[in-house]
């Protein structure tokens, strides 16, 4: 399964709490080895998180990786397919709807 992982800092803390959380998330990240194949990590320019593009046959491994960072980051996993596959699926859906 291909996926895009979106991560953002958890909201709600004071400035000092947010700074401590940011520091800890960077420490954890420096010691972490992904359980899934990560093709690309990118950070948002505004410092409010980022995205990872990856692939796995084990969704439970991805869940474990997200759980490691859950005290510091909100993670949203978007399963994705190649755009050509998406276009083929949409074309089949249009054909189905036009026939029925």
Functional labels for PLM-detected ranges:
Residues 30-31, 35-36, 55-88:
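An amphipathic, aromatic/His-enriched active-site/gating alpha helix that lines ligand/cofactor pockets
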Residues 1-48, 82-100:
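Short S/T/G/P-rich N-terminal loop/turn motif that feeds into the first structured element of a domain
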Residues 8, 53-55:
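Short hydrophobic/aromatic beta-strand micro-patches
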Residues 49-50, 73:
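A short pocket-lining beta-strand/turn micro-motif at the edge of beta-sheets
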């Amino acid at each position: 399964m291909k996926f895009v992982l979106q991560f953002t800092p958890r909201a709600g803390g004071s400035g000092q709490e947010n700074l401590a959380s940011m520091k800890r998330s960077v420490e954890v990240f420096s010691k972490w080895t992904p359980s899934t194949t990560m093709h690309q990590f990118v950070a948002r320019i505004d410092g409010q998180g980022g995205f990872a593009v990856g692939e796995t046959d084990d969704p439970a491994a991805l869940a474990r990786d997200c759980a490691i960072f859950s005290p510091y980051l909100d993670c949203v996993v978007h399963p994705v397919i190649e755009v050509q596959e998406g276009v083929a699926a949409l074309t089949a859906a249009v054909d189905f709807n036009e026939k029925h």
